[in-house]
Amino acid sequence: MSLATTNSVAEIRARNKELIEEVLKVYPEKTAKRRAKHLNVHQAGKSDCGVKSNIKSIPGVMTIRGCAYAGSKGVVWGPIKDMVHISHGPVGCGQYSWGSRRNYYVGTTGIDSFVTLQFTSDFQEKDIVFGGDKKLDKILDEIQELFPLNNGITIQSECPVGLIGDDIEAVSRAKSKEYGGKTIVPVRCEGFRGVSQSLGHHIANDAVRDWIFGHIEAEGKPKFEPTPYDVAIIGDYNIGGDAWSSRILLEEMGLRVIAQWSGDGSLAELEATPKAKLNILHCYRSMNYISRHMEEKFGIPWCEYNFFGPSKIADSLRRIAGYFDDEIKEGAERVIEKYQPLVDAVIAKYRPRLEGKTVMLYVGGLRPRHVIGAYEDLGMDVIGTGYEFGHNDDYQRTAQHYVKDSTLIYDDVNGYEFERFVEKLQPDLVGSGIKEKYVFQKMSVPFRQMHSWDYSGPYHGYDGFAIFARDMDMAVNSPIWKRTKAPWKEAPSAKLQAAE
Amino acid sequence: MPQSAEHVLDHVELFRGPEYQQMLAKKKIFENPRDPAEVERIKEWTKTAEYREKNFAREALAVNPAKACQPLGAVFASVGFERTLPFVHGSQGCVAYYRSHLSRHFKEPSSCVSSSMTEDAAVFGGLNNMTDGLANSYKMYKPKMIAVSTTCMAEVIGDDLNAFIKTSKEKGSVPADFDVPFAHTPAFVGSHVTGYDNALKGILEHFWDGKAGTAPKLERKPNGAINIIGGFDGYTVGNLREIKRILELMGIQHTVLADNSEVFDTPTDGEFRMYDGGTTLKDAANAIHAKATISMQQWCTEKTLSFAAEHGQDVLSFNYPVGLSATDDFIVALSRISGKEIPEQLARERGRLVDAIADSSAHVHGKKFAIYGDPDLCYGLAAFLLELGAEPTHVLSTNGNKAWQEKMQALLASSPFGQGCQVYPGRDLWHMRSLLFTEPVDFLIGNTYGKYLERDTATPLIRIGFPIFDRHHHHRSPIWGYQGGLNVLVKILDKIFDEIDNKTNILGKTDYSFDIIR
């Protein structure tokens, strides 16, 4: 039992407020004022979490955020498997994001699929001085020659491209024409644009709108016969196979998934999506833009869902079924019933080991709220959460549907703040990213990466929930956490007991 | 249903059952997939000499390059100084990438800040970002030094670090006498090894040459000490510790510059040490008085060594010394420069490595190897293979230049085992793929990304290099020194024996050779 659950809500609120005040003391005055707006304690009944968000990070504080390129190449476009994605600019961006996001796909890599290849224009000084358009032109030729089965190409701009005045749109148009209308998509996701990955998602969504939807013929036919039960999965990047363990449930309830955006997705699936009867949206943050666009332009409704943990999965299956006829509604009930024994067995096994354990989260798009239900299904208590690049609509959803009264909220948290919060609250588990993992493990606090699933997964769907439960248990209950102090050193402190 | 609470299946096995396989097969119709026969035809075509020729004719596109960008090397060097916070001026996403990259390799925290420049800074310059950033970092993280480098954004718009730091100090971001060395590290020049060089030179220049005009230049008073520079090295933890052990055995007064062997290997005991170990700032300054500066990696330290030489020091560089002869050269040089005798202990360690090579070389002799990696690492590994009687066949370094190529060729020409070897500067791993198909070898040595080549070409991969993401803790053991050479030998032998076992383990078919003694 950790310190954090031993007090009343009022006491927790007071302690969290005090903690925020204490943390802010480290800053120069101007910075303290700015950071104060991003930290708060959730008050039940409020429409949002009471924090500002989607604002520029402060220099020098060690923000955990990334950039627009990461949001476009790394998140939205990169998983589209049959297209070549060029990291256009110097070598680093593509190198550091090469294969690290675990967007699973099935294909013959290097021949008809390209997700785990690092294509880059590897800018040199002369490209900066004379511009990179000619090089880009040649790169597109070389890709066509050496990778002839690619179904399209995207150009993911790195910082210099937008600073040196390159016209990648003109190159794209000209080369597309030269190659008989080939899909070539220029994406203006230079890293200095916007305040985080988030603008990169938006820019990437707009590029789909303009360069994919804008180019398919009105009469364009999908290469399959439409049915009334066609849906598209939007905003699932198939990390560790998440989209697959989701798709299987949708198909078992009688729906047909005609596209995955974008994990294990293909250009044909993007192009066919306007034929869907419903778009179901998992990561709202990164793909609400294109969902809204399809609603306006093609009249396709969209609904958010959450496939983490059995409670939210059942709610979501019913919500999705609500858009269809009784056959699908019965299908949803059938699926829920089918998996109930698995859910019961997982909870019977793991809940006693995890009951009452506290969790602090800090992740990206949807997970700071979406995974809370899965923890609660295991009897765990999320006592702090925050978004790397959330907007106010994320905090509204969090406040209205997920977090408990007095939860500590931290937007665009930085290394210093996060360490202090964890040090004081001593959760039994922290769920965040690779940059945070080893910091907290050094502090003897169990940790799971909640971007990459710590190389495990999938975590979506019923199959994923079993893995999620297993993984949280192996982190929290690893025997090593009881052995981090040398026996001849002083008795374990309160914080260590809390970690046990 | 494949899943159960008793035996939880994750991604490794979950998707292999009929439920998921049928689902994935049905998904195909929506993918507009290529004709499988065509996929097969192209796959086979990519293995041909014709494809290789087209592949090597590439002028613009890089596919799977084996190099990173300058600031990564700058960050790596900077954390090797006492309580030093690396501060990268430019877009913030870059810093998230360096930190992730280093953490994935070392399985350790990696602390570094960004000045978080955005569109307005692109237009007006990043002075305010520098001023605010230094003030915040200084107050929050209480560093003893902030080492500034740049992303390509700041370089393209032409931000002047020297002027910006001066102005920031005038505005009170950090005290006037607080150490803020800097280096311009454009990502579109060189690679991470260049960034290492620039950052280290920037730090030494700061201490030796009057702290950007704010202090008198140091006057060199030569002593008998030796400076050691490791260079960018994925094995920095094990290697620098081994070098220090050797120097202490020999009783040589020394300073390891950019000593990040502690910060990338802190204990788990309840405390997070954001800073740990590192060359003290005092030692960094006093390093000017050393008799000599020795670099373990020539191409990581070209500017830094010239700088030390300009200050009157003897300078000497090695090329990632691995194995017997290279370690001999290193030890003998240490003895010559310091005037210290080589202790019997090192002779015994040497003898043990010779012993191990003699015991096992029959298994390595004549085996063909492809190697890729940073220029010095390639050189060091090739030299070791030659002395094992192995035959390096392809040596490829994306960040190797013409001078490197010439030096590599001279090394290969010096041995009968190097006669069949070609050297490839500036090439990438897609080129290597063609090489492995058209001129196959027995083993491949490289970093984690070599596993894609292993999968495609069935060339067994021996993981030595940076980054290694998918095997744990190897960076903690040295591969320098006689003991390090032994570690490399064992890595190579283990893979060779595993391969023989894998080829001979079919019951009743090939297992007559499944020997119990090898």
UniProtKB/Swiss-Prot annotation, chain B:
Write down the SUPFAM superfamilies for this protein, in alphabetical order.
Answer: Helical backbone' metal receptor
**Protein name stated in the entry:** Nitrogenase molybdenum-iron protein beta chain
Q: Which Gene Ontology biological process is one annotated for this entry?
A: nitrogen fixation
GO molecular function of the protein, one example?
Answer: iron-sulfur cluster binding
The record's subunit annotation is:
Tetramer of two alpha and two beta chains. Forms complex with the iron protein (nitrogenase component 2).
Q: Which UniProt keywords apply?
A: ATP-binding, Iron, Iron-sulfur, Metal-binding, Nitrogen fixation, Nucleotide-binding, Oxidoreductase
Residues bound to [8Fe-7S] cluster are: C69, C94, C152
Q: Name one GO cellular component term.
A: molybdenum-iron nitrogenase complex
